[in-house]
Every structure is written in C-alpha cells, then in structure tokens.
C-alpha cells in the first residue's frame, strides 16, 4: 500500500498538479479528509491527453467534497421518499376493499425474486416449491431483526401470517421496490404510477449514497431514460445531453419523486439542504 508521499508522487505521474494546493497541504488532505483512491477517481471526469490528466489536485479535492455533500443530501431525500411511499402504500391497502392486509403479502411472498420475468404464476410450481419460496422471502424481510436465530417476541407472533403493516415496515428498500411494483401491476393504482417508474432509479442513488460511492464521477452514458422524466426535464429546459448521463438521470428521478410523494412539510425541510448544495456548486 502506498504511503501518503508515494500517493502524491503517483498523482504527479498522472500529471495532476499542486499549484493551487501544495504537496504539504495535499498530504494533510489525504491523511484527514479524502483517501487516495476516491479522490483519484474524480480524475476520470476530465479528458486524458498524452497519458495524463493535466489538472489541479485542488479540483479533485473540491469535487470530492461536493460529492460528499451531495451524497448526504440525496440519502436524506431517499429516506423521505421511502417513508412517504410506505405510508401511501399502506393507506391504499387499507382503503382497498379487495384487500385485508394479509392476502397481498401472502401472494407476494409466494413469488420468487424474478417474478417479473418468470415464475410469476405459482401454478407452474409444486406446492412444496411455492412454500419454499414463501419461507425464503419471509426470512429475507425479517433477517435484520433476527437475533441469534430468533425473532423478537413482538414480531414472532406475526411470522406465520404476517400482515402488510408489519412486512412493509421492515422491508429493505429493494424489497419494498419489488412489492411496490407487484402491487401496482395487480391494481394499476394511478397514485403509484410515477413511483413505480422512478423508484428503481431512486434505489440506485440510495445505494450510492449509503455505500459511500461517488455520484459525480464516472459519468457514463445511459439510454434508459423513462419518457416521464424526459418530459419533465424538457419542460424545465434540461438539455438532452444531460439525460444521457446515468447518475444525472438517477439524481433527477430522486428530486422529482421527492417532490411528488412527500408532504409540503418534508419538502420544505429539505429545501435548505438543496439550496446550500446549489450555492456550493456555484
């Protein structure tokens, strides 16, 4: 593993300069604020010429700081969205005369994780296979509450026949996105249409933010832009070029869905964070 002086030497080999921030200050930044791999990762945002990047260390350090603030802000937004959508889904189930809160979960648990592509029809499997899938999916939902192989007493009584209000509370985001899609396909509820389109993109940002992965780096092209997002962006003057960037698509989806499903109080609570972030970008 390179020591801090060797890390700076390596950056110099990449034609990264230390005119704005000198090597002594850069050494301190690498020790206290940003580790080498992550900071160097942002160099890929710049065009490489003659085997080097010819950029200032200060720019990489600033990008890393901005990205950290962006990740913190987006993480809070995705948590707001998750909370608001779980509340909305439970409300819709409660108001649905065809549901009692148990049947929908039982159906969902019987479907394997690839239900959107195969095995959606439980009739194509044996009762034993369906039960195996059900137990596996149920254990997956409650696994982070399982202490030493045993559920807490308050949850244990629900395990055999868990209701929606228990399962949804403890679903991880990926599980909830799958359930949201399942419920929307079953009832085609207009209140969930936009969420069903955007939540897979929101999940991308949540994963990056929660796992400390850069957002404004590795700005790869992606053609999977939902038409809904394109129309929204076009209405507010976002260029087509921006819609070719994967991380931008995911970020825009998060901002749009937050505005769609969260209460005014929650939106206003995040306005200050977004405003400060915008000022920092400038």
What are these model-derived regions, one by one?
Residues 212:
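Acidic/aromatic/glycine-rich contiguous surface patches that form carbohydrate-binding/processing clefts
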Residues 1-204, 216-282:
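Extended intrinsically disordered or low-complexity regions, especially N/C-terminal cytosolic tails and loops
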């Amino acid at each position: 593993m390179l020591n801090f002086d060797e890390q700076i030497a390596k950056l110099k080999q990449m034609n990264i300069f230390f005119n704005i921030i000198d090597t002594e200050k850069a050494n301190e930044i690498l020790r206290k604020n940003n580790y080498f791999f992550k900071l160097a990762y942002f160099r890929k945002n710049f065009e490489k010429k003659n085997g080097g990047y010819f950029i200032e260390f200060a720019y990489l350090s600033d990008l890393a700081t901005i990205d950290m603030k962006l990740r913190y802000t987006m993480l809070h937004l995705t948590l707001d969205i998750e909370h608001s959508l779980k509340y909305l889904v439970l409300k819709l189930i409660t108001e649905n005369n065809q549901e009692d809160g148990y049947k929908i979960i039982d159906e969902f648990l019987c479907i394997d994780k690839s239900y959107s592509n195969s095995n959606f029809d439980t009739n194509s499997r044996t009762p034993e296979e369906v039960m195996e899938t059900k137990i596996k999916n149920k254990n997956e939902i409650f696994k982070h509450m399982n202490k030493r192989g045993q559920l807490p007493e308050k949850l244990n009584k629900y395990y055999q026949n868990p209701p929606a209000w228990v399962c949804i509370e403890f679903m991880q985001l990926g599980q909830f996105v799958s359930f949201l899609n399942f419920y929307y396909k079953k009832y085609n509820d207009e209140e969930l249409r936009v969420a069903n389109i955007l939540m897979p993109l929101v999940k991308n940002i949540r994963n990056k933010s929660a796992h400390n992965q850069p957002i404004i780096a590795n700005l790869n092209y992606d053609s999977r832009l939902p038409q809904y997002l394109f129309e929204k962006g076009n209405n507010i003057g976002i260029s087509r070029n921006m819609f070719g960037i994967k991380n931008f698509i995911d970020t825009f989806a998060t901002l749009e869905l937050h505005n769609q499903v969260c209460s005014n109080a929650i939106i206003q609570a995040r306005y200050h964070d977004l405003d400060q972030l915008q000022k920092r970008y400038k």
